[in-house]
A protein has these predicted regions:
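Catalytic-core "active-site belt" of small-molecule-metabolizing enzymes
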Residues: 1-176, 180, 187-224
């Protein structure tokens, strides 16, 4: 059960359960840049995606609003993403982290997605309220690495496919009630690396508001 403060025509608090979680990958609009990045990752052993974009189904039990995320081993990292939630008849927008096991990623991306929880924030915006200026929304993240807080990601959603296009490519005209979809991310500044703390933000510069969430990453030992 997740609890959200929903900002629409009025502010309401809702307790929600979900029965489907989709993680959309390779959602950028620039296909040439995507192909270049796919080739770069292939050189370090990350398998080529079966399609672009690609949609991974992962366990809905991974959705969490925790402030502490336990992970197995030192090779995981977060990445900020806009997240769609279908609640009742409406679609809502939140912020989340597609935390991923990077070591497992070389064996299979779907496996790497499944191994880590997916933290999400506690506030949502009605998607209809931001649909008209989706391209101007900005995602950011900060990572605490070796005790230093650094800007880890930053980019406008205009470089990513719109939700309507993602849903069409997924094979649906709308997100089914009870489903959530991570919509993709932007590159990591300085490269992907693990962090002890991950802060994420979705900014709406038009309506002058922000969604945010932060969590600590606790690394559990790998015991043979």
């Amino acid at each position: 059960m997740l609890k959200f403060v929903c900002h629409g025509a009025s502010e309401t608090t809702r307790e929600c359960t979900f029965d489907a979680l989709i993680v959309a990958g390779w959602t950028g609009r620039d296909t040439a840049a995507l192909e270049h990045h796919i080739e770069e990752l292939a050189k370090i052993g990350v398998p080529r995606p079966s399609s672009v974009p690609v949609f991974y189904r992962t366990s809905v039990n991974g959705l969490t609003q925790t402030a502490r995320l336990d992970v197995l081993g030192p090779d995981t990292s977060g990445e900020v993403e806009p997240v769609l939630f279908a609640i009742g008849d409406d679609m809502w927008l939140g912020v989340g982290s597609d935390h991923t096991d990077r070591k497992a990623e070389t064996m299979g991306i779907a496996l790497s997605k499944q191994l880590c929880g997916k933290p999400v924030g506690r506030e949502l915006w009605l998607y209809a309220d931001v649909a008209g200026h989706w391209d101007k929304l900005v995602i950011r993240s900060w990572a605490t690495i070796d005790g230093k807080r650094v800007l880890y990601q930053q980019g406008a959603l205009g470089i990513m496919r719109r939700p309507e296009e993602l849903l069409e490519l997924y094979g649906s005209t709308r997100l089914a009630p009870g489903a959530a979809m991570f919509c993709g991310t932007v590159g990591a500044i300085g490269g992907i690396r693990p962090a002890a703390r991950f802060e994420m933000e979705l900014e709406d510069p038009v309506l002058r508001r922000r969604l945010a969430h932060v969590y600590e990453v606790v690394t559990l030992p790998v015991i043979a």
